């Protein structure tokens, strides 16, 4: 059953990517982050209330860090979607799992201190090979699909995957502390709305496009559902 939920979440995530691609023709990345967060706040507040889950938390610092890295990843991903082919932007963001594996390998080696009581951890050759293969695969994919003027957007997309890895690890840490999912996602929505609003001061706002603005609604709904 958990595998089915993961497949459904991936489908919702991909569907949101399509909506972001359509909306990016009318809104910049900061606006998309802002409206995604604003719609998510309303939905998640109602969800938490229906589940009788209090939104007050004992771990504001951890939620703030999760929101910081999550919003950085979200903004970078939305920017990449607007500038790159959708499949390329999605693949770069999905690199988060490879980044997590790289962080785990690097963290284990950095934490090890050579003493007689703590021998050097076993070399995880298969894990290292998997990480390297993942990065090589992305490089091979990007070489034929990126134009010269898309190199910066490609780097931003790669950054979205790296920061998403930090965000996912923080979500795991919060869940181990007993934080409900709806509370964690609610604070992320708040962080998205605040960060997007601040960024709009510097990036400016787009002219309201009329009916195409309806793409903002499924972005917020699918984000909350995923």
Model-inferred region functions:
Residues 26, 80-83, 120, 147, ...:
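Helix-loop interface residues and adjacent transmembrane-helix termini in multi-pass membrane transporters
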Residues 102-105, 122-143:
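Hydrophobic transmembrane alpha-helices of multi-pass small-molecule transport proteins
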Residues 31-38, 79-117:
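Specific alpha-helical transmembrane segments that line the substrate/conduction pathway
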Residues 10-15, 45, 67, 71-75, ...:
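Hydrophobic/small/kink-forming positions within alpha-helical transmembrane segments
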Residues 1-31, 131-132, 136, 146-173, ...:
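Glycine-/small-residue-enriched transmembrane alpha-helix faces in small-molecule transporters
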Residues 1-9, 53-78, 152-160, 207-225:
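Loop-to-transmembrane-helix transition segments
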Residues 44, 141, 145-203:
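Transmembrane alpha-helical segments that form core, pore/gating elements
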Residues 2, 27-72, 100, 163-167, ...:
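Transmembrane alpha-helices of multi-pass small-molecule transport proteins
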């Amino acid at each position: 059953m958990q595998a089915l939920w993961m497949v459904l979440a991936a489908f919702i995530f991909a569907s949101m990517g399509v909506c972001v691609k359509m909306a990016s023709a009318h809104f910049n990345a900061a606006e998309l982050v802002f409206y995604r967060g604003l719609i998510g706040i309303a939905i998640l507040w109602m969800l938490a209330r229906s589940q009788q889950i209090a939104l007050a938390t004992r771990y504001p610092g951890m939620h703030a860090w999760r929101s910081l890295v999550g919003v950085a990843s979200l903004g970078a991903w939305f920017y990449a979607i607007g500038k790159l082919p959708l499949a390329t932007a999605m693949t770069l963001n999905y690199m988060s799992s490879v980044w997590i594996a790289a962080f785990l390998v690097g963290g284990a080696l950095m934490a090890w201190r050579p003493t007689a009581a703590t021998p050097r951890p076993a070399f995880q050759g298969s894990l290292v090979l998997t990480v390297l293969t993942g990065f090589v695969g992305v490089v091979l994919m990007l070489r034929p699909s990126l134009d010269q003027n898309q190199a910066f957007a490609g780097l931003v997309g790669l950054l979205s995957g790296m920061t998403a890895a930090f965000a996912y690890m923080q979500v795991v840490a919060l869940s181990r502390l007993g934080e409900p999912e709806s509370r964690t996602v609610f604070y992320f929505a708040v962080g998205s709305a605040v960060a997007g609003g601040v960024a709009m001061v510097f990036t400016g706002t787009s002219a309201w496009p009329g009916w195409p603005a309806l793409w903002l609604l499924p972005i917020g709904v699918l984000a909350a559902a995923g």
